[in-house]
C-alpha cells in the first residue's frame, strides 16, 4: 500500500509542477503574444510535457522535510490515500486502453493500404532528400485514408489518400508530413498521450495535449512553407485537405509499431 501511495503522491506533485509551468506559458501567450518567437513557445511547451513526468515536487518535499514524508502513513489517512491511488490506477489503465484502441485502428488500417504509384514514390523520395532525411520511411495509400497523416515511431509511415492530386499539391502534403517526422512530432505526441494517461484526473490536462498538438502544427507549417515556396499555395492545400476531414475522426500520429 505504501508503495502505491508514494507513486501516486509523486505523480500528483509532478502534475502540480507541470500545471504551474503551463499557467506561466498561458500568461506568456496572453501578455506577450507576438513578442516571442513561435519556436520559443513550442520549446517551453515541450519542457512542460517533460515536467509532468519529473517528480521534482516529490523530491523537494523529501529534501526539505528532513528526509521524511509529507503524508502520515497511519490509520485512516493511509487508507484514504490508498483508495484514491487505486481509483487513479483504474483511470490510468482505462485511458491507456482507449489510446491503445486508437493505435490498433491505425495498425489495422495500415494492413488495408497498398504501395503508392511509382511517380508518387519518386516525388516522396525527392522531398525526403531535400529535407535531408535519410531514414527509410514507407509511403502508402488507402481508400479509407481521408487526409495525409504520419504514424509510427519504430517504423514510420506516411499515409496518403488514393485520389489523384496535382504535383504541387502532392508535394505540399508530403513536405508537411515529412516536416512532422523531421521535428520528431510523432515522438512528442506519444509523450503527450502518455501524459494524458498518467494525469487523466487533471481537468486541464487535455488542454495541454491540444496546445501541444496545435503548436506542433504551427511550427510544422512555418518550416514547411520554406520548402513549398508560396505561403498562399501551401495554406490553400492545407485548407482543402482539412475540409475533406470534416465529420471524420482523424487518427493521431502517436503510434508505436
PLM feature spans:
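Membrane-embedded and juxtamembrane structural elements of multi-pass membrane proteins
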Residues: 2-257
Amino acid at each position: 500500500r505504501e508503495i502505491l501511495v508514494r507513486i501516486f503522491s509523486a505523480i500528483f506533485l509532478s502534475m502540480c509542477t507541470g500545471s504551474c509551468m503551463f499557467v506561466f506559458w498561458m500568461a506568456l501567450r496572453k501578455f506577450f503574444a507576438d513578442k516571442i518567437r513561435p519556436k520559443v513557445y513550442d520549446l517551453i511547451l515541450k519542457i512542460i510535457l517533460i515536467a509532468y513526468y519529473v517528480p521534482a515536487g516529490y523530491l523537494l518535499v523529501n529534501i526539505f522535510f528532513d528526509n521524511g514524508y509529507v503524508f502520515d502513513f497511519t490509520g485512516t489517512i493511509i487508507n484514504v490515500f490508498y483508495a484514491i491511488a487505486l481509483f487513479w490506477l483504474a483511470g490510468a489503465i482505462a485511458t491507456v486502453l482507449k489510446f491503445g484502441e486508437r493505435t490498433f485502428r491505425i495498425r489495422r488500417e495500415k494492413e488495408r493500404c497498398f504501395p503508392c504509384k511509382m511517380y508518387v514514390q519518386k516525388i516522396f523520395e525527392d522531398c525526403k532528400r531535400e529535407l535531408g532525411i535519410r531514414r527509410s520511411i514507407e509511403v502508402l495509400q488507402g481508400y479509407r485514408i481521408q487526409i495525409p497523416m504520419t504514424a509510427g515511431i519504430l517504423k514510420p509511415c506516411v499515409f496518403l489518400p488514393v485520389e489523384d492530386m496535382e504535383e504541387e499539391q502532392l508535394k505540399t502534403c508530403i513536405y508537411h508530413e515529412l516536416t512532422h517526422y523531421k521535428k520528431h512530432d510523432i515522438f512528442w505526441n506519444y509523450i503527450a498521450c502518455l501524459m494524458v494517461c498518467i494525469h487523466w484526473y487533471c481537468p486541464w490536462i487535455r488542454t495541454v495535449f491540444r496546445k501541444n498538438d496545435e503548436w506542433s502544427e504551427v511550427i510544422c507549417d512555418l518550416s514547411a512553407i520554406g520548402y513549398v515556396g508560396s505561403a498562399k499555395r501551401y495554406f490553400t492545400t492545407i485548407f482543402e485537405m482539412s475540409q475533406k476531414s470534416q465529420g471524420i475522426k482523424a487518427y493521431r500520429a502517436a503510434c508505436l509499431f
